[in-house]
Amino acid sequence: MEFAFGSMGMQDKAKHLATLYLEDLSDFIVECIDENFGFSRYAERLGRSANSFDELYNHLQNELTFIDEITIKILKERAEKVQPKLVLISVPFPGNLYSAFRCAQFIKANYPNIKLS
């Protein structure tokens, strides 16, 4: 393995090993906790199938996943602390679509006075 990392050997090797560790952690979460998990693309498959929103809609009707619970907990804490009148949600990638809708769903249900855009 030592020859594969060139003159930046230690740093490159550390990055490589950290990436392998994170990939294994992600695989564990997908298999045991939330099948839609991804570090940079949570539920990306649902966003990519957006020619029909049926599958996405069905997932939004399900119970919160463990990852959803963490996201909603943080969102609730921020909403109560900041007390915004308007929340803007950006969806730059398909992997952001599910979480954006899940957050919007939570805000609409629990903070009807907050405008969403």
Please state what every model-predicted region is:
Residues 1-117:
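A short, structured N-terminal alpha-helical element that caps or precedes a catalytic domain
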